[in-house]
């Protein structure tokens, strides 16, 4: 039984922490791997450093680098795992590019979708968990968080509000594969809600 499950959300949604907690619960009963974008494979991790830790760059260059990392990650890690019947939990995927580069950066959602369609070759997630948090709460968490801030963390509040608007538009248009989880709750509640959502999906396939 294979399943491709992605996690999406704005900065400060707690997404990376939630996916880690959910993974450690699922791995007790399922053949599951956890990975991330950009990154997940050596080439992808190098691209991650460029786009998240480097200086400002042309927005289309940024979009193309994310797509290139995505392709390499799919070919080397995600597709082989799915062929082996694994459950793949992925921290970000195509919807991040649509919301961040397509919507918030202003390139255009359909333009970025076309670029990423070439990269993913039709491989959309079976289920996408969207961790729903307001831009204000997300920003507060980023400021309080001890981790180093990347280029996206450092964008202003207006940018993060546009990211959320982008996600809302995507979810409206593709509601069949999205499940929204209230990420304004305490972390343990977010983890539990996310875990139960995934379990319900896996029990049906």
UniProtKB/Swiss-Prot annotation:
Gene Ontology terms: cellular component: cytosol
CDD domains noted in UniProt: TMPK
Enzyme Commission number(s) of this protein: 2.7.4.9
InterPro entries cross-referenced by the UniProt entry: P-loop_NTPase, Thymidylate_kin-like_dom, Thymidylate_kin_CS, Thymidylate_kinase
Residues that hold ATP according to the record: 9-16
PROSITE patterns: THYMIDYLATE_KINASE
Gene Ontology biological process: dTDP biosynthetic process; dTTP biosynthetic process; dUDP biosynthetic process
Reaction(s) catalysed (UniProt annotation): dTMP + ATP = dTDP + ADP
Xref: Pfam families: Thymidylate_kin (PF02223)
Keywords: ATP-binding, Kinase, Nucleotide biosynthesis, Nucleotide-binding, Transferase
Taxonomic superkingdom: Bacteria
NCBIfam families attached to this UniProt entry: DTMP_kinase (TIGR00041)
Protein's job: Phosphorylation of dTMP to form dTDP in both de novo and salvage pathways of dTTP synthesis.
Name of this chain's protein: Thymidylate kinase
Organism: Staphylococcus aureus (strain Mu50 / ATCC 700699)
